[in-house]
């Protein structure tokens, strides 16, 4: 039996994108997509009709406005409408096309026919309900940072991806030559999406290990520690996780951190310094930053 879905459309200032994705995820939305509308972003997301009433949607709209106030940004415009199951399955995908990232990656939607030629590393992806399609500046900054970090061949490199979402960064690391990647996320839907994308990219489960959890779960899997840490989540969550990385990171480990607005980067840097890390570089794209850090 076909079910109906709410299509939620949010027109927002670009620096609200991360908080809106997070809020929509907390609301239970699936299949988010983003497109540019002039100087603004239009974000679409979907939630089953049975899971949300109009009062719930009105509350969501209010929360998004409150989030914007906290981030000192203009309030977003939120609209919603009902669509049927078939429309949901195809609607958000219509707005997502292959995306070149950095010098080496081509992020390729799983439902499109693969190109016959080209010299880029093809990273096939169907994010499902998980964050990470390659269109967000933080994801692109992380992938570009991985290109730089893994440009010199290493005999062996083990990486942890904390809050892996769709698995896009983990898969990118494997394609660039990482020996082993441990990817974890507290969201079971993200774990399912990451495992599906691992299969799409024909990566062996022993090379990319994906489990539900966080730092503690990686420590159980890799008690010897890791050479690199990837973490593209909200800044306040990164601050909470930094103290736990001491036991996880090898003495000369590095980390690539994003999900961080430029004006949040100093607080991250201060916390890193308290726990024996130093910021080696800071890359920017729009309102977003990516920190390259290493153990001091």
From Swiss-Prot:
Domain of life (superkingdom): Bacteria
InterPro entries, sorted: Ribosomal_L11_MeTrfase_PrmA, Ribosomal_PrmA_MeTrfase, SAM-dependent_MTases_sf
SUPFAM superfamilies from the UniProt entry: S-adenosyl-L-methionine-dependent methyltransferases
Keywords from the named record: Cytoplasm, Methyltransferase, S-adenosyl-L-methionine, Transferase
Protein's GO biological process: methylation
UniProt function note: Methylates ribosomal protein L11.
PANTHER family membership: ELECTRON TRANSFER FLAVOPROTEIN BETA SUBUNIT LYSINE METHYLTRANSFERASE (PTHR43648:SF1)
Identification of the protein by name: Ribosomal protein L11 methyltransferase
């Amino acid at each position: 039996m076909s079910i109906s879905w709410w299509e939620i459309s949010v027109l927002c200032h670009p620096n609200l994108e991360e908080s809106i994705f997070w809020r929509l995820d907390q609301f239970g939305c699936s299949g988010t997509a983003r497109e540019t509308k002039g100087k603004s972003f239009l974000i679409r997301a979907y939630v089953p009709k049975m899971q949300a009433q109009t009062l719930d949607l009105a509350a969501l709209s209010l929360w998004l406005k409150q989030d914007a106030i906290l981030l000192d940004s203009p309030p977003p415009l939120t609209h919603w409408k009902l669509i049927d199951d078939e429309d949901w399955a195809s609607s958000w995908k219509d707005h997502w096309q292959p995306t070149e990232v950095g010098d080496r990656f081509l992020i390729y939607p799983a439902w499109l026919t693969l190109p016959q030629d080209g010299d880029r590393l093809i990273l096939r992806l169907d994010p499902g309900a998980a964050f990470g399609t390659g269109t967000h500046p933080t994801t692109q900054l992380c992938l570009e940072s991985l290109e730089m970090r893994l440009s010199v061949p290493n005999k062996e490199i083990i990486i942890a991806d904390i809050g892996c979402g769709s698995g896009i960064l983990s898969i990118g690391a494997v394609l660039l030559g990482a020996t082993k990647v441990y990817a974890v996320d507290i969201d079971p839907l993200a774990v399912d999406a990451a495992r599906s994308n691992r299969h799409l990219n024909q990566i062996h489960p022993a090379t990319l290990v994906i489990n539900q959890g966080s730092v503690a779960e990686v420590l159980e899997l890799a008690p010897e520690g890791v050479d690199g840490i990837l973490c593209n989540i909200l800044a306040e969550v990164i601050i909470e996780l930094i103290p736990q990385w001491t036991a996880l990171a090898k003495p000369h480990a590095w980390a690539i951190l994003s999900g961080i607005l430029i004006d949040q980067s100093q607080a991250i840097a201060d916390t890193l310094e308290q726990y024996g890390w130093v910021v080696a570089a800071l890359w920017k794209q729009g309102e977003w930053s990516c920190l390259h850090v290493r153990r001091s």
